[in-house]
Amino acid sequence: MEYLYEKLTAYGNSDYYAFHMPGHKRNMELMRARLPYNIDITEIDGFDDLHHAEGLLKELQENAARVFQAEETHYLVNGSTVGLLSAVMGCTERGGRILMARNCHKSVYNAVYMNELRPVYIYPEFSEETDLNGEIHVDQIKKLLEEYEDIQVVVIVSPTYEGVVSDIEAIAEIVHEYKIPLIVDEAHGAHFGFHSYFPQNANTQGADVVIHSLHKTLPSLTQTALLHINGRYADRERIRNYLHMLQSSSPSYILMASIDECVRGMDECREEIMDTYVECLQQARERLKQLKNIKLIEAEHYDQSKIVLSVKNLKNTDGEVLNGKRFQEMLRSYHLEMEMASGSYVIAMTGPGDTQEGMDRLVQAVMEIDKNILCEELSGNDEDHTIKNISYEMIPLEQAYSSFEAGRMEGESVKWNEASGRISLEYVYLYPPGIPMIVPGERITSTIVQKMVKYKEMGFSIEGLSQENCLLVAGNPE
């Protein structure tokens, strides 16, 4: 039998380099090798209570608000998930309507279910060239706000998992014309605003509620995050109440100390930490732009911390058609772990925890792989040449029932090839990034079936299937 602690210790002592979260990258020098078991306590005298902060924790949260340029900030020890749940439920009435980006994290969908909300989806524009889902445009939001007058809140993701950034300032302006709040899932942008190389923090761009996953890109432990509230449109008291209900009643002081250390470091050592990191990152990106075949891809408005490397339309010298999953395996042979693989690309997440040695290893490995790749137009007969079909493009599906209604229906398990035309009773996610491709209550199409089957064949992780290669659907075919 394997034991978790021993397995983690062995991995931590190995030479595998992490181009994935958490953002501290196991860099013990940066983390100052603190946070051992001997500081794991409960709410004893002198250490305050997160759920009724009046002393130390109240001061620390106020300090975090100052550092992240927010009016009000709350520590989260259950990750951005509890922040998104509390924000959405605190800004909506039961049964209300929500305008949300289709590429929202599954926690937003869970909030929709819990509050019996009626979602209206904004679909990001998809780039055929890069296979990236693009930004959310203000015109899309304006059109839907005009069409649905009862929308209670708008929720978008910026930056996306791949680093695509939306114009928060313009979106906030149009949303506020309707006197409703804008929630920005900026989980992947906790580093925003700390260096001119990166976009501005959404707190400074008019967002009413902003959620930051500190652990994703900054030096902080997994599960640590912040929820910020600004302006007059978000119901602060209701959000606070949901935080009390949904967040652990025994918040870890180790996690809260990690948040404090992270905030303190970004406040007191910002220039030293960020200048060193950005210089290292810029050098790596410049070198990766020189690749002959593999492409360093990005969007017009982009977070440069994400290194997205595409092998679209490429073969290796053995004639094997490449995809993101295969590329990820090739990089793993160099003891480099990527954050995720998509149909045609991999994502290397970077942050101030990265080292020059780590960046050099990534660049050198990719350059070596690049030498053994052929760039050519693939024919329609090429096996596995289905890059378009295995992209993360959001496919619109008919919403026959709300997710709450679907959750109360009787269902049966059917094979994927029998699911077309049926009503799904469960979520189907590609994980990471945890974005639902199918939501309960939606009618399944042959296109989405083919897409999921292809992902499964290629070894991607599909969560939500009730059984192997089966899907739970409504009992009576419509």
Task: Provide a role label for each language-model segment.
Residues 1-38, 429, 433-436, 465-466, ...:
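N-terminal glycine-rich, Lys/His-bearing helix-loop that initiates the first secondary-structure elements
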Residues 4-9, 30-31, 67-70, 80-298, ...:
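Conserved PLP-enzyme active-site core in the AAT-like
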Residues 26, 161, 216-217, 232-234, ...:
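Short, glycine-/Ser/Thr-/acidic-enriched flexible segments
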Residues 36-79:
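Conserved N-terminal alpha-helix of the aminotransferase class I/II PLP-enzyme fold
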Residues 74-76, 154-157, 346-351:
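Short glycine-rich or small-residue beta-strand-to-loop segments that form or flank ligand, phosphate
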Residues 116, 121, 457-468:
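Short, compositionally biased
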Residues 286-447, 451-464:
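Conserved C-terminal alpha-helix-loop-beta "cap" of PLP-dependent enzymes
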